């Protein structure tokens, strides 16, 4: 419902939905059933005002969800409830002056989980700044800070099976996460020359209060949630370069991605005497990806498209263990013939994946 006034615009929004999600896992040992019921409602009111390039909006609402799960076999908690109610307020501001545009969003939410008897104050402030030098050049900067809780499956306190050999145990803990994200972006475009280039640098850091401990045996992998403050961070540098040649009916592009991820992992191991102990290790993963693409359309009745993906990644665990870098290469070729209103397409794909130990799969 929207009401326009001279001083601004009022908007009233209400949504209610119900979802039933049955799932089952059938194995030789027996059958596990997950019957999940979700009743969700969100009701809000918002006020919007624009004046002389300045926009302000204030939104307030109440949000609730009744989420229940019945799990079989009954040796685990079979009637789980993660119902919660929240009150939220979201002020938003935008200012545009000439070549500059800036925004500020300040969401704030107070949330209560009834069965867990826990209350939280969540937030997600973010800001965005854009500078458009001229028609060709534009730059932007973005930053955000978000505190959130785990989803429905994260809150389940017991042990449950996800596939034929993987188990997860919430261990009765309540996971929370605080993430900060920063992004720097730039672009250049020249439509006359059909030349475009973009580049982005993104950094993200997450701080968590829990960490999954991994235990591996011959017939099972068990992930048990432990109360252990930890963090992870990642860097991503990406760029896309595209060039079209109109006279040749040709379009080309190249996308490059370079990323690095760091974090901590917890593994449960047995010593020489058979005693179980937990080992906390740092890890690092580096990845490089290149995607060239060519589209050639010399006539209305024919088009050829070539698309390749080249990925190269390597890992480091602790201070001594370095895993062999692996190369993945995928090539795709599509030939399209148009006869009247009928399109005939021939496609071919080639895969080459490194498996380690100087072996690969084609």
Predicted regions span which residues?
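Exposed, low-structure sequence patches enriched in small/polar residues
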Residues: 2-362
């Amino acid at each position: 419902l929207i009401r326009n006034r001279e001083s601004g615009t009022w908007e009233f929004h209400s949504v209610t939905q119900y979802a039933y999600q049955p799932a089952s896992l059938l194995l030789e040992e027996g059958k596990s059933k997950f019957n999940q019921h979700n009743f969700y409602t969100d009701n809000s009111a918002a006020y919007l005002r624009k004046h002389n390039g300045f926009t302000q909006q204030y939104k307030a609402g109440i949000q609730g969800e009744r989420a229940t799960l019945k799990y079989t076999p009954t040796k685990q908690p079979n009637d789980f409830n993660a119902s919660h109610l929240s009150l939220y307020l979201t002020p938003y501001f935008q200012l545009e002056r000439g070549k500059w545009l800036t925004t500020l969003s300040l969401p704030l939410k107070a949330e209560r989980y009834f069965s867990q008897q826990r209350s939280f104050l969540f937030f997600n402030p973010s800001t965005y700044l854009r500078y458009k030098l001229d028609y060709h050049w534009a730059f932007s900067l973005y930053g955000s800070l978000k505190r959130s809780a785990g989803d429905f499956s994260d809150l389940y306190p017991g042990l449950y099976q996800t596939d034929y050999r993987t188990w997860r145990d919430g261990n009765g803990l309540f996971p929370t996460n605080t993430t900060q994200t920063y992004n720097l972006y730039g672009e250049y475009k020249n439509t006359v020359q059909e030349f475009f280039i973009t580049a982005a640098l993104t950094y993200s850091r997450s701080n968590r209060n829990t960490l999954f401990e991994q235990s591996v045996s011959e017939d099972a992998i068990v992930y048990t949630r432990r109360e252990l403050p930890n963090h992870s961070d990642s860097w991503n540098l990406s760029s896309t370069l595209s060039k079209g040649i109109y006279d040749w009916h040709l379009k080309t592009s190249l996308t490059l991605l370079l990323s690095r991820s760091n974090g901590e992992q917890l593994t449960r191991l047995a010593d020489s005497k058979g005693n179980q102990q937990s080992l906390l290790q740092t890890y690092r993963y580096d990845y490089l990806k290149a995607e060239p693409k060519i589209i050639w359309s010399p006539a209305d009745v024919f088009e050829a498209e070539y698309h390749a993906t080249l990925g190269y990644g390597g890992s480091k665990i602790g201070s001594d263990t370095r895993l062999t870098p692996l190369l993945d290469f995928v090539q795709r070729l599509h030939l399209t013939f148009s006869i009247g209103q009928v399109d005939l397409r021939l496609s071919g794909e080639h895969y080459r994946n490194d498996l380690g130990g100087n072996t690969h799969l084609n």
